[in-house]
Amino acid sequence: MAFDYKKEYKEFYMPKNKPGIIEIPQMNYIAVRGKGNPNEENGEYKNSIGLLYGIAFTIKMSYKGTHKIEGFFEYVVPPLEGLWWQENTQGLDYARKEDMHFISMIRLPDFVTKEDFEWAVQEATKKKKQDFSKVEFFPYDEGLCVQCMHIGSYDDEPTTVDLMHDYMKANGYELDITDTRYHHEIYLSDPRKCDVSRLKTVVRHPIRKTE
């Protein structure tokens, strides 16, 4: 049976729909950076998703080819994630989606090295006749965070974020969004197949102890 990161690491991917504090260890991702409204057809964000899955499935299916990854085991591709920010803005202003910057990403299993990633980019480029040069190997050490499961429209996330920030302050923490620590979303539902009222998204914000 394929290893499923969502089920094996429920604390990261399946939190309760009430806020909690969690320490996130460093993980490696495949990632694509971009800017613009995530809802724009053929925009940078939607294009980034296609690039990510092209590499993710090349790595996932590598065991069927000649490139052997040391320590490989069969697994379910982890969910799509996104780091989001806007210039000169603490958090996100959902009314200014065109100003959003993002790092779209998918977690890599620990056994995938940078060399394996580089092989996958070359292999996908050759087989799919597509440019994957925007995809990068991205280690991210997220650290201490407050997180919560948000159920419903992405545009309603501010309500969940307010709950997270109230919980954070009540427990002696403050927000620590910086140039290297971001508003983080993990997408557990496919918006093309799920009613908007039932979308499940993990929302995560970096924090630090209040001095």
Where does each model-flagged region fall?
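A solvent-exposed interaction/effector surface
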Residues: M1-E211
